[in-house]
């Protein structure tokens, strides 16, 4: 799933320099674009409390038809059933101690990058069963894990740790990368 997405994104960046030739002119009916694609909105929802939604990072699991969304203001990973995309249904989320910054899914496992309440301290990568939402494992990451992804073969998890300084710059952890070997269950 990720490889075609990466290829599509790379093609989009490459072809964006040619897009002006295909946009048309004001008042003209737009065509279907370079690849014959036309996007149509089929549904929308607000993730989070109040009028403001939170959906910075999300990951979709095709088997369960669930969308997992980082929701830092509510301290959770929100879970949505989008088997009917025009009518998404919010399910029980995953409450966390710390702030979720990123999510990814691979073959029945959800990985969550969790920021420590003290941003300069090490965060964690938490793994959950995609169906039951039960915690499977937790691994220590560097300071402020800001991105998490599975390797294409699912053998590894990689996290980018931002390492943000405190307000007066007396503590400034270095940025780092965490690599987790899932077979050996070690960092």
PLM region descriptions:
Residues 1-2, 19, 40, 64:
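Generic cytosolic/nucleocytoplasmic N-terminal low-complexity/intrinsically disordered segments
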Residues 30-187:
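Mobile, glycine-rich extracellular loop/lid and propeptide segments
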Residues 15-38:
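Bacterial Sec-dependent N-terminal signal peptides
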Residues 8-16:
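Bacterial N-terminal signal peptides
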Residues 2-8:
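Sec-dependent signal peptide recognition
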């Amino acid at each position: 799933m990720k490889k075609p997405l990466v290829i599509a994104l790379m093609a989009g960046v490459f072809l964006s320099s040619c897009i002006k030739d295909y946009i048309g002119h004001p008042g003209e009916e737009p065509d279907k674009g370079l690849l014959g694609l036309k996007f149509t909105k089929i549904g929308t929802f607000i993730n989070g409390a109040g009028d403001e939604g939170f959906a910075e990072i999300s990951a979709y699991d095709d088997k369960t038809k669930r969308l997992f969304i980082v929701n830092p203001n509510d301290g959770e990973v929100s879970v949505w059933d989008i088997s009917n995309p025009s009518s998404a249904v919010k399910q029980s989320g995953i409450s966390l101690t710390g702030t979720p910054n990123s999510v990814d899914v691979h073959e029945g496992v959800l990985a969550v990058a969790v920021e420590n309440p003290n941003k300069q301290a090490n965060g964690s990568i938490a793994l959950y069963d995609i169906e039951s939402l039960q915690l499977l494992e937790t691994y220590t990451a560097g300071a402020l894990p800001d991105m998490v992804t599975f390797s294409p073969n699912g053998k590894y998890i990689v996290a980018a740790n931002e390492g943000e300084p405190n307000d007066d710059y007396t503590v400034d952890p270095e940025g780092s990368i965490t690599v987790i070997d899932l077979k050996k269950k070690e960092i």
